[in-house]
Amino acid sequence: MAPQKHGGGGGGGSGPSAGSGGGGFGGSAAVAAATASGGKSGGGSCGGGGSYSASSSSSAAAAAGAAVLPVKKPKMEHVQADHELFLQAFEKPTQIYRFLRTRNLIAPIFLHRTLTYMSHRNSRTNIKRKTFKVDDMLSKVEKMKGEQESHSLSAHLQLTFTGFFHKNDKPSPNSENEQNSVTLEVLLVKVCHKKRKDVSCPIRQVPTGKKQVPLNPDLNQTKPGNFPSLAVSSNEFEPSNSHMVKSYSLLFRVTRPGRREFNGMINGETNENIDVNEELPARRKRNREDGEKTFVAQMTVFDKNRRLQLLDGEYEVAMQEMEECPISKKRATWETILDGKRLPPFETFSQGPTLQFTLRWTGETNDKSTAPIAKPLATRNSESLHQENKPGSVKPTQTIAVKESLTTDLQTRKEKDTPNENRQKLRIFYQFLYNNNTRQQTEARDDLHCPWCTLNCRKLYSLLKHLKLCHSRFIFNYVYHPKGARIDVSINECYDGSYAGNPQDIHRQPGFAFSRNGPVKRTPITHILVCRPKRTKASMSEFLESEDGEVEQQRTYSSGHNRLYFHSDTCLPLRPQEMEVDSEDEKDPEWLREKTITQIEEFSDVNEGEKEVMKLWNLHVMKHGFIADNQMNHACMLFVENYGQKIIKKNLCRNFMLHLVSMHDFNLISIMSIDKAVTKLREMQQKLEKGESASPANEEITEEQNGTANGFSEINSKEKALETDSVSGVSKQSKKQKL
């Protein structure tokens, strides 16, 4: 059932071609079949808006003829080519969303339970927020850390052996004397770090125990409590005294006694107290000649990165004979060779000898498991929410395999977490449209999982909202169905697929922009919300197809964080950490101040007094950042306030006066500014004579001028009492009168 496309002209129109109006299908057919000019114009209007008006009788006849003529069926090649285009159009977005689904499972960008339309997925309440204190966070973390350390120290590895299975062995005619158990020895192999003097990595083998394991037992008749078990203490996994252990492995060694019959007896020793290391080579050779076989297998517990490899569960290990697969210190590879032919893994377990056991990490012998259970990636049949522990629920004490616990867990979760209103399952149909034609319709689905990311939305409204917001490469239209809902899926031609990530990452290494290692700082922006409308109630009408046929575009609410700025001097991208500091702001660091003073000291065509004024003035301009002509009047007054005392103490008043006159010659300051600066300087000088400080100096005096300022006249030791001015040679008393 194809979707009905409504035209924008308000109906199918009138005339003979009214039945084909209302969409683009009838219009294109009318254009192809019409011969007269009136028919062409009528067909065009029909295809565009759905309205039609015959201008002459010839156009009506042409339109009627078009309706009578048989429509040619498209060739099979065109149909197949069109179908290939349909598959290609939907293939790329589907692959993208499948990839994002896997990445979001590993490192999610956001949590679905925090969304407003997914509030039913959030099972937590905010009751604890009333009593929450920031100071309690540290104590909670310390408590959790202490529990983990004590937990890891008390935990030990418990192995329960189900049996040793060797399917190739045929039962002996002497079944009464046939031995029905084998000797299993478990050793903990410690591969230590290689020291400088060592040629290879030192390997230590620590025996953990021997057990008699049943041979080819019938699991239906054997009780679980009768299986032999072995415990490995957690102290064995601590670093040794002489070497730092790199990895830990379990070595299983199964010894099967021989079958050589002599007076009704079977050769082979079953004593558990025999130490393997004390066995003599001659004795081993004799035992092998008698028919004794040894099978070995090795499994890694902790790898070189201290990652746990053996989790709780049931294991079946393929064993290999000692002669065929000698254990060496070289790097091991997984191989399965029988009669010169490589076998698939499942055939190995069906033909070769295997050892079955159950592994648990426990604090005590009857304690629950402490090691984390490996959870597979979520599928469309798995729930995303964690199961809440209810008072009536009883947990089994025995260890369950991962594959068994997964299926039973899902059933209990579905029964507990599914609300009553969703007990009645909805049938969801997905109909894929391409070029306004129905190309494919899926089978009915009884769940509300997203087909692209397998998210369980639980509600039809939440599913449609999720599809619309998270998979915007498609257009989803909701169509009511008596048994549920039909969702029309089409390609969003107006989708903006431009890069929306951090613009700084584009200028880094190739591929860095599309990687995600964690939260990063973005450019700070500010938006003013003038009006925040009230959130509308959830309604299914927002997912219906719009009447005008326009595609609803997702408006970008925030775009300032994607802007990219550049340094004007280096043309490098401005990082978000540098946004708070203006790169154009000319600060005066210490090295720049020293460089400025050094350059002024190198001048040879100015006297010492002018150099001192130039130093003070340049440092003053650099510090406050004066760059415009209209700032010079204020700069002069501020210079007098900050450096007036230095000018007076260093006898630089006449030099400063010449500097002001020079600035006036270049039209930088006015005469009024000169008068104000001189008046301010005179007041400061009068206060200094009275012993009062005019204003505190902002900078300390770096150099004391004991000699003359300009170098014209020399001051003798006899004339120091007069303190003559360096330029005019007038004494202080006459200088006061002039000022």
UniProtKB/Swiss-Prot annotation:
Highest taxon in the source lineage: Eukaryota
Post-translational modification: Sumoylated, probably by PIAS2.
Keywords: Chromatin regulator, Chromosomal rearrangement, Disease variant, Intellectual disability, Isopeptide bond, Metal-binding, Nucleus, Phosphoprotein, Proto-oncogene, Repressor, Transcription, Transcription regulation, Ubl conjugation, Zinc, Zinc-finger
Described purpose of this protein according to its UniProt entry: Polycomb group (PcG) protein. Component of the PRC2 complex, which methylates 'Lys-9' (H3K9me) and 'Lys-27' (H3K27me) of histone H3, leading to transcriptional repression of the affected target gene. The PRC2 complex may also serve as a recruiting platform for DNA methyltransferases, thereby linking two epigenetic repression systems. Genes repressed by the PRC2 complex include HOXC8, HOXA9, MYT1 and CDKN2A.
Expression sites (tissue/organ): Overexpressed in breast and colon cancer.
Interaction with AEBP2 and PHF19: region residues: 146-363
Result after altering W334A: Fails to interact with PHF19. The PRC2.1 dimer forms but is unstable
Source species taxonomy: Eukaryota, Metazoa, Chordata, Craniata, Vertebrata
Misc: Under hypoxic conditions, the precursor SUZ12 RNA undergoes regulated trans-splicing with the JAZF1 RNA, resulting in a chimeric isoform which may be protective against apoptosis. The chimeric transcript is characterized by JAZF1 exons 1-3 joined to SUZ12 exon 2-16. The chimeric transcript is expressed primarily in the endometrium from late secretory and early proliferative phases of the menstrual cycle, but not in normal myometrium at any phase of the cycle. Its expression is slightly induced by low levels of progesterone, but suppressed by both estrogen and high levels of progesterone.
Gene name in the database record: SUZ12
Impact upon substituting E610V: In IMMAS; decreased trimethylation of 'Lys-27' of histone H3; no effect on interaction with EZH2
Compositional bias of kind Polar residues: 704-715
Positions carrying Phosphoserine: S20, S541, S546, S583, S726
Single GO BP term: oligodendrocyte differentiation
Assembly and oligomerization: Component of the PRC2 complex, which consists of the core subunits EED, EZH1 or EZH2, SUZ12, and RBBP4, and various combinations of accessory subunits including AEBP2, JARID2, PHF19, MTF2 and EPOP. Within the complex, interacts (via C2H2 zinc finger domain) with JARID2 and EPOP; JARID2 and EPOP compete for SUZ12 binding. Also interacts with AEBP2 and PHF19. Forms a monomeric PRC2.2 (class 2) complex consisting of at least SUZ12, RBBP4, AEBP2 and JARID2.
Protein name (record): Polycomb protein SUZ12
Region (VEFS-box): 563-639
Pfam families: VEFS-Box, Zn_SUZ12
Family: Belongs to the VEFS (VRN2-EMF2-FIS2-SU(Z)12) family.
Gene Ontology cellular-component terms listed: chromatin silencing complex; ESC/E(Z) complex; nuclear body; nucleolus; nucleoplasm; nucleus; protein-DNA complex; ribonucleoprotein complex
Zinc finger residue extent: C2H2-type: 448-471
Region feature Interaction with JARID2 and EPOP, mapped onto this chain: 79-106
Compartments (UniProt record): Nucleus
Positions of crosslink type Glycyl lysine isopeptide (Lys-Gly) (interchain with G-Cter in SUMO): K72, K73, K75
UniProt cross-references to PANTHER family, sorted A to Z: POLYCOMB GROUP PROTEIN, POLYCOMB PROTEIN SUZ12
